[in-house]
A protein has these predicted regions:
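Bacterial Sec-dependent N-terminal signal peptides
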Residues: 1-22
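Extracellular/oxidizing-compartment recognition motifs
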Residues: 21-310
Length: 310
């Protein structure tokens, strides 16, 4: 409890200081940015000793996942800026994930079509991040994401909108590098990000402690109650409507095989077992439809799970 109170007080003081320095005026973005590509960011900070305590504060106009030493910094599935009136700051104590020699921060960013609609410059606000805390000798340290980081466009994966205006994810599992968060592995097609400054930031909100953030947490895993097929595909119906995504476990799918699943276009890697699910978006649904190309056979579907996220 004492540690938690200390964390909150430290965070409050730091956020107030960050706002006084106009947190969010310094952003990084991929040099070949566009309004649909997903981007991976990564940087390793070397140390002589394990920091005594450390925090990460970050902001993004898009959707993102944040890791340190390959560990998700919280239980949230992903983060998103849910307000058109300001920029949300997310702050987390990452002390328990720290290593004594080096610490790698990795961020998976995806654009938000809605944000691009109400904020034309959102394409330049991919990531603003601060990593700070206390060294073993009780002195402070501070780092900010800048052009010393490495970034890479996630090939074959993007977020766009469908014909109805809803978000649609495209995920190509053939080109996804599962080791992209790791320190030891060079980032595929890595480049240095560009700095993208803002002269002024209005309405900056923090998630702690004054502005509680209703995040994207996994609440329940649901099972379908009925299955049927017709000319439109294979349908799985759940007992009730839920907000979230679905996770499809596949076996024996061919490399390059394409599946359409309620807002997701998934391209198979050809591994013996693989899972198709939306990683950075959600929607409300009660029935899902799986439609495949000529290589698809419904016997490839081993399991269907409804992931209720709110």
């Amino acid at each position: 409890m004492i540690r938690r109170i200390t964390c909150m007080l430290f965070t409050l003081l730091w956020v107030l200081n960050s706002q006084s320095q106009e947190f969010g005026t310094h952003w990084i973005t991929h040099p070949n940015r566009n309004d649909s590509s997903e981007v991976l960011f990564r940087h390793t900070y070397t140390t002589l000793q394990r920091p005594l305590q450390a925090f990460i504060t970050f902001a993004s106009i898009g959707h993102c996942k944040v890791y340190i030493n390959e560990r998700n910094i919280s239980r949230e599935i992903f983060y998103e800026n849910k307000t058109a009136q300001g920029i949300l700051l997310h702050t987390f104590d990452v002390t328990r994930y720290l290593r004594p020699d080096s610490n790698t921060i990795a961020v998976w960013y995806a654009p938000c079509p809605q944000a691009l609609a109400y904020t034309p410059t959102a394409i330049n606000k991919q990531l603003s991040l601060e990593y700070y805390g206390t060294k073993p000798d009780s002195t402070a340290f501070y780092h900010q994401a800048d052009d010393t980081w490495t970034c890479s466009i996630l090939e074959g994966s993007r977020i766009s909108t469908d014909s109805t205006g809803h978000a649609m994810e495209v995920f190509d599992n053939r080109s996804y590098d599962h080791s992209w968060k790791a320190t030891e592995q060079p980032m595929k097609n890595g480049e240095k990000p560009m700095r993208s400054g803002m002269l002024k930031v209005e309405h900056t909100y923090t998630t702690l402690p004054a502005f509680p953030y209703k995040g994207n947490f996994l609440k329940n895993v649901l099972s379908p109650i009925s299955i049927y097929s017709d000319s439109l595909g294979t349908h799985f119906e759940f007992e009730r409507t839920f907000r979230g995504s679905v996770r499809i476990t596949l076996r024996g799918a061919k490399k390059g095989e394409r599946l359409e699943i309620n807002g997701l276009l998934y391209i198979c890697s050809g591994e013996m077992d693989e899972q198709a699910f939306r990683r950075l978006t959600t929607s409300r649904q009660k029935t899902i439809t799986i439609k495949g190309d000529r290589y698809f056979d419904k016997s490839q579907i081993q399991k269907v799970e409804g992931l209720e996220i709110y």
